[in-house]
From Swiss-Prot:
It comes from the Eukaryota. Gene3D superfamilies: Ribosomal protein L33. Belongs to the bacterial ribosomal protein bL33 family. Keywords: Chloroplast, Plastid, Ribonucleoprotein, Ribosomal protein. It comes from Chloranthus spicatus. Disulfide bonds: none annotated. GO terms for cellular component: chloroplast; ribonucleoprotein complex; ribosome. This is Large ribosomal subunit protein bL33c.
Length: 66
């Protein structure tokens, strides 16, 4: 039997450099990834280096609230 309910949470990662620069004419949008994290192992907000197709480079993507 499962010990707890909803241990794995679905989170959305958003590009921090796109958000900081704002959506302007140069950038057509904001890069977002959907992933899961284990609440017991990572209680803090998740930050990963992912590729941003709008910045054309690897940037830090941080967890946002739903």
């Amino acid at each position: 039997m499962a010990k707890g309910k909803d241990v794995r949470a679905i989170v959305i990662l958003e590009c921090t450099s796109c958000v900081r620069n704002g959506v302007n004419k140069e950038s057509p949008g904001i890069s977002r990834y959907i992933t899961q994290r284990n609440r017991h192992n990572t209680p803090n907000r998740l930050e990963l280096r992912k590729f941003c197709p709008y910045c054309y480079k690897h940037t830090i993507h941080g967890e946002i609230k739903k």
